[in-house]
Swiss-Prot record:
Transmembrane segments annotated in the record for this chain: none
Knockout-associated phenotype: SPRED2 knockout results in a dwarf phenotype characterized by reduced growth and body weight, shorter tibia length, and narrower growth plates as compared with wild-type mice. Mutant animals regularly develop kyphosis and scoliosis, and show craniofacial defects, splenomegaly, and cardiac hypertrophy with arrhythmias.
Cellular location(s): Cell membrane; Cytoplasmic vesicle, Secretory vesicle membrane; Cytoplasm
GO CC annotations, alphabetized: cytoplasmic vesicle; plasma membrane; transport vesicle membrane
Domain WH1 positions: 5-122
InterPro entries per record: KBD, PH-like_dom_sf, SPRE_EVH1, Sprouty, WH1/EVH1_dom
One Pfam family recorded for the sequence: WH1
Annotated organism of origin: Mus musculus
Protein name per its UniProtKB record: Sprouty-related, EVH1 domain-containing protein 2
Phosphotyrosine PTM positions: 224, 227
Stretch list, region Disordered: 127-171, 274-294
Chain intervals with Polar residues compositional bias: 146-156
Amino acid sequence: MTEETHPDDDSYIVRVKAVVMTRDDSSGGWFPQEGGGISRVGVCKVMHPEGNGRSGFLIHGERQKDKLVVLECYVRKDLVYTKANPTFHHWKVDNRKFGLTFQSPADARAFDRGVRKAIEDLIEGSTTSSSTLHNEAELGDDDVFTTATDSSSNSSQKREPTTRTISSPTSCEHRKIYTLDPYPMDHYHPDQRLPRSYPQVTFPEDDEEIVRINPREKIWMTGYEDYRHAPVRGKYLDTTEDADSYVRFAKGEVPKHEYTYPYVDSSDFGFGEDPKGSVIKTQPPRAKSRRRKENGERSRCVYCRDMFNHEENRRGHCQDAPDAVRTCIRRVSCMWCADSMLYHCMSDPEGDYTDPCSCDTSDEKFCLRWMALIALSFLAPCMCCYLPLRACHRCGVMCRCCGGKHKAAA
């Protein structure tokens, strides 16, 4: 790969972090492209390579450590996209195979929706920016990362001058945008740091809400750390500042105790009694429980990486969370027999196979798969119990008495 294409950040539909993989047909496995490493991969809108004046979509991947372009693939209508597992997806275009290993299932779902959106726009022939770019309502607030920039890329870039030239995604005209800078660049020496106004945060003296702010928290995870034990990302924090910025806290007056102790008259103590023997049994009222803070706060789930509210967290809300009832149903109905048969007899070269009870008639092995399952049910009659038990489980999930629950990251 070369360092030729550098799309604008504003032209991306979706952009995530992943490891670019390549397919080796000789060994039948997937291997990291160009030695591996975390890359910024996204679906962006570019001018069509054929030069017919129409716009197209490009899957562009750039490795972070050396800015090397390791993936360039134009999206076409005949693109075959496969979701092998929650964190590994691959696709095929013109006998070329590409794969991505994501850091979390949420990133994988966001990239999948971005590719499907690009294919839909190609099929419909829509090239307007309003129907393709920044469709946050359809892609979701937690999954799409179109304007986020990590600190590693910020530190490697130099300060831009006050006049910049940008290009519109749907036009070839160049326009200049003039920004008013309160500190002119020629007023300072090159090695002098520009003054910066630090934000000031004042916490209210209410003890019910406790705000935790970590200014060094990054919106992107770095390295290969497990996404289930990754630090909670600050979704609503402004991460445009450099990593060395900090938050100044305005200290208010120290709140005083409001405990009122009962007054005991000296006449209550007898002359023959020891004053130390009288104990005040009235305790001050306990402070308000902080359960409200736990119920009202939002956290990120370790399973699906989505934000959730503790107050609304019930069973069946997280599809990626472990479900003991569903696991028990699969074991009782011996569904492992069907999985083993489909893996050895009806899987593709990558080892992927359709769900045993899928009713998708577009599958070319639909009839063959169901005939094999019926024949296998004569050897394992308990497989016939799977469909009614699965239907009961779905009813339980709808009633919020079965299913997995979100779990907050530590």
